[in-house]
Curated annotation (Swiss-Prot):
One of its GO terms (molecular function) is FMN binding. Transmembrane segments: none annotated. Probable inactive dehydrogenase; part of the gene cluster that mediates the biosynthesis of fungal ergot alkaloid ergovaline, the predominant ergopeptine product in E.festucae var. lolii. DmaW catalyzes the first step of ergot alkaloid biosynthesis by condensing dimethylallyl diphosphate (DMAP) and tryptophan to form 4-dimethylallyl-L-tryptophan. The second step is catalyzed by the methyltransferase easF that methylates 4-dimethylallyl-L-tryptophan in the presence of S-adenosyl-L-methionine, resulting in the formation of 4-dimethylallyl-L-abrine. Substrate binds at H171, N174, Y352. This is Probable inactive reductase easA. One of its GO terms (biological process) is alkaloid metabolic process. Keywords: Alkaloid metabolism, Flavoprotein, FMN, NADP. It comes from Epichloe festucae var. lolii.
Amino acid sequence: MSTSNLFTPLQFGKCLLQHKLVLSPMTRFRADNEGVPLPYVKTYYCQRASLPGTLLLTEATAISRRARGFPNVPGIWSQEQIAGWKEVVDAVHAKGSYIWLQLWATGRAAEVGVLKANGFDLVSSSAVPVSPGEPTPRALSDDEINSYIGDFVQAAKNAVLEAGFDGVELHGANGFLIDQFLQSPCNQRTDQWGGCIENRSRFGLEITRRVIDAVGKDHVGMKLSTWSTFQGMGTMDDLIPQFEHFIMRLREIGIAYLHLANSRWVEEEDPTIRTHPDIHNETFVRMWGKEKPVLLAGGYGPESAKLVVDETYSDHKNIGVVFGRHYISNPDLPFRLKMGLPLQKYNRETFYIPFSDEGYLDYPYSEEYITENKKQAVLA
C-alpha cells in the first residue's frame, strides 16, 4: 500500500502532514473530575504520533464548565487543564507530529445530573428534547448565545495561544450544540438564530468568524455529520440546502479544512445499514471544492481508505481519511497500513473506562515497527 496516495504529503493549515491518515476525535473518559487530562493521556497521544508528520485530532473538549455535559471528559477553560494539555502538545511536537484540539459544547445532549451538580441548566437552541421522554432543555436567551460564542473564542485562545495546539476543530456534528442550531427539528426559534437557513447557520458561522479573528484562519477547522440521525438530527426536509449554505459560508470565511462524518457508521466488513446512499459525502465534498483539505470519517479500513483516496477522489489531492477504533488498537496504524501489516482487533469493553489505562495504553506496536525504529535510532 506504500504506493497509495494515502502516503503523500498534505498541507493542512500551517502543518505539512507526511501522510493522509488522521486520528479521529474520540471520547475516552480519561480526564479527572475537574476535566484535567490524566497523566497517561500524554502517552496515549504520543503512541499514536508514531510516524513524524502525523495529524492527531483530540477527543471532544469542553469549552467551559457549563458546556461540559459528561463526567471525566476534558476541558480547556482552567489553568490546570491548559497545563495538562500543554504537556500533551509538547510531547507530540517532540515526536515531529501535529495535534489539534476539538472544541465542544454539549447542549441538550448533556447528562442532566452532571449539569445540575455544577449549578447549570440543560440548554439548547429551543425547548425540544433529543427524543420523546428525554429531558426538555431550556432555550438559550440571546445574551446566553453570545456568551457561549465567547466561550468558544476563549477556549480557542487557551488551546492555540496558551497550550500550543496547532489548531482547533469546532465540533459541529453528532447533535451537539452547533448542530442543534443548524437543524430545524431541534431549532424552532423565530428570531435571528432560527426560522430559516441563514439564521440557523448564524450561531456556527459567528463562532467560526470570531475564533478565526482570535487565532487565525490557518488554525481553525469544522466537523459536520451531514447525514447522521444521531441524537435527533438528520430528518429535516431542507437538509442539503441547509448544509450547502453553511459549507459555502465556511469556505468564504476561509477555515483551514472541513471534516465530514460519512453516512456509514459501521465497519467496512459489515456495510449492511447505511443512513444515506452518499456514503463518501460526495455531495458536500463537491461543494467544498479542491483547494483546501477535506477529512472523511466513517468506518474506514485499510482497503476502503485506499479506495476513497485513490479512486473515489483520485482527482482531489487534499483528501484525508480519519480512523477511530482501528487507531485505538493500532498505535502504529500508519506504519501498519503502509507496510501492509494486519491490524490488531479492538475491545469495545475498554473504550470508556475512567481512571484506567486498560484498553488505552496496552495495545502494542508491531514487531516490524519496533525493528524499524531501532534501525533509525542506530542511523541517527
